[in-house]
Amino acid sequence: MPFAAALSTHPVTAHATGEVVGQILDRLGRHPDLAVLFVTRPHLGALEDAAGTVRQLLEPSVLIGCGAESVAGNGHEVEEAPAVTLWAGVFGPVAPIRLWSEGTEDESGRQQIEGWPSSTAFTAQALLLLADPYSFPIDGFLRELGGYQPGLRVLGGMASAGQGPGANRLALDDRVFTGGAIGALIGPGIVLETVVSQGCRPIGRPLVVTKAERNVIYELAGEPALERLLEMARNGMPDRDVQLINQGLHVGLVLDEHKVDFGRGDFLIRNVLGADRTNGAMAVGELVDVGTTVQFHVRDAASADEDLRELLALRHADGALLFTCNGRGTRLFDQPDHDAGVVRDLLGDPPLAGFFAAGELGPVGTRNFLHGFTASVALFRDSK
C-alpha cells in the first residue's frame, strides 16, 4: 500500500515527531512524494523543528503542514491535547505552492493574490490547501481559481491553532510561515475522490427565490421568506425539528438547477444569519440570486452522522486526509473519534491523518467553497 499514517500523543515534540516518523519509515520507507504534518497547540512553537525532522529522516518530495486545535490519525481524534500526526504517500507527481496577499486590490476591488505558478510539469487534478484565516482571502481566491483553473478541486482547511493574526503556523518544505496559504498540487498519478459532508438534513420542500438582494432573501415562491418558514413550523413539523430551528437554521442552495430531484451533495449549506419580522426577509451566509432553488436545513449529531456515513458508503480508499470542523468532535457528538472512526469503519481503516479546521475547503458540484461544521475528506486510491 503506497500510504502510511501515524499519531503520537507524547507531550515532548522531539519525542512525538520521532515516533511518527519511525512508524512511517517502518510502513512506507523513505522518499514519499508527499508528507502531511499536523501538530496541536502545545507543539506549535516547535513546528519548524518537527518539520525539519520529517524532512531530514523521511526526505519527502513535498512537505506541508500546520498547527491545529485538534488532530486526527488512524481512526482516532485528539482534541485540545498534545498530539502530532503524520501522513505520507507514494503516488506520483506533486508540486508545492505558496500563496499570499499583500492586501492590495485590483480595479474591481478584489484582493490580489500572489504566488500561483505560471506553469507546472503536470496537469493537476486537485489542490491540498492549508491557509491562515486572518491573512488569506480564501473566498476571493476560490472564486478566482474557478475562473482560470476550472475543474481543479480544492480540499483542505484553515489553520486553527492560532487565536489571532500572526499566531498560526504553516509549514512548506523547509520554511514555516505565519500567514498566507501553502499547499500541494496533486498530479494524475493517483485516483482522488472528494467527500464533503455538510452534516445537515432538509426540512420542508424546495422553494424558488423570487426576490433577493445580495445575501438577503426577501421572498420564497412569492411569499415573505420568514412566513414560509413559520408556515412549515405550524403545519405538522416535528417538535424536534422546531427545536433544531431555534438552535440554528440553515439554508441549502441548489447549485445545479438542471436537476429535477435534489439529494445529498446537491446543496451548498449556509447559515441563516437573521430575519426581519417587519418584512419577512432573511439574511444568509452567501450571495443569492433570484431564481435559485433553496431548501431549509437543520443540523444535529444524528444528521451529521447519517450524512457522513451515506456519502462514504460503498467507497474505497488506500489513504485518506480528513479536514473536519473544530465545532464537530465531542462538541457535536456524544462519543470521541467520530469522524475519523466512521472513515475507519466504512473504508477498511485506510492510513488517515487530519485536523480540526477553522473552516473546511471542498467542492460542492463543480465549484470549491469554504464551509463550516463540515467534514471534508480526500480519498486516495492506487490507480494500479
Predicted feature residues:
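Small-residue-enriched flexible segments
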Residues: 1-34, 39-55, 60-62, 66-320, ...
